[in-house]
Structure formats: C-alpha cells, structure tokens
Amino acid sequence: MFTTQEITTTHRHYSYVEQLMHSAFPENERRDDAQQRKLTDAQGKFRCALIQTQYKEPAGVITYWKFADFTYIEHFAIHPDHRSQGHGTQVLAALLKEWRHPIVLEAEIPALVGDLAYRRIRFYKRLGFRICRMPYWQPPYRYGDGWLPMKLLMLGNEPPRRIVDEIHWEVYGVKNSRLMKR
C-alpha cells in the first residue's frame, strides 16, 4: 500500500524528492531547484506530494496544480526500486478517484524520445487518459530554452483552449501562448 503526503522543503525527505526529480526528468522538463523550493513552500495552487510505502519509506513524488475546475499533473515519478510492480498505477488510480475531473498532464512524443515515452503514454492510457488532438508545446522552464513539442493527455473531455492558456500562464508564466514564436 502506497500513500501520498503533501510536503514542504522542511520535510525530512525533501532532498529525496529533489534527487528523484533530477534523475527522472531532464533539466529542460523541470524548473531549477530554487524555483521549485519556492513553489513548494508557497502553498498556493501548486502541491508537492511525497509517495510513501506502507512503512513510510519514500518511493516517489508527484507535483500538481489544483485549479478551480481541473488538476494539472506536472511531474510524476516512482523511484526505480519501485517501478514495474504496479505501484505507480496504484498511487495514481487512488489520486484520480479523489481529484475532480478533468485531469491534464503532458508527456513526451514517442517518435521524438523513444520507447520510454511510448511506455509512459501506454501507462496513462491504461488509467483512462486520452491523447488530445490539439498540437501542444510546453513552454520553457528557463530563459533561453526552447519550447518542447509534447502530447497533452486528459482524463475527461478534450480541454478547451482556456485550460491550456491557464496552464501556460500559471505554471510557466507565459501569457498569450498562442502568439509566442515556437
């Protein structure tokens, strides 16, 4: 049995969260540590949750944004020691039951990244997510980085453009993202 616990940077396992984020996500798919810590401690719409075993040992992390009418999963990672055993499915399925719909997340395009991205998308599809038809670009986390072509996945109906605009503004600080040069 795995559980989640919302944490701040003062939690004794926060360094574990940072290390897992570094190993699970390339630099251009996560913000720098100082920005991440600031968001984690702000306790606004952003949440950082430690995934724990039944013995309270750290096993993963999920970061997400709770908006008025949807939830955006920004990062989800299970430690390699706990992967391929159904633990990620168990954790995410439990969260999906308690969160309001729609739920949105981004995933790499398999043709650009390879087999891992393909397996990741299959994982989300098994949980009921659908790939959205609209083209999607993830804004850069850092000045000077480029926009990343991604797939937008949704549990619920196809997201209106307003949801994408809200994610771009609240998460990435980009207003009028449709006008931005990619």
Give a label for each model feature:
Residues 78, 84-98:
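Conserved acetyl-CoA-binding loop-helix of GNAT-fold acetyltransferases
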Residues 152-159:
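Conserved beta strand-loop-helix elements of the APE1-like EEP
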Residues 1-34, 149-150, 162-182:
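Short amphipathic alpha-helix that is part of the acyltransferase structural core
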Residues 99-116:
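Conserved GNAT acetyl-CoA-binding A-motif
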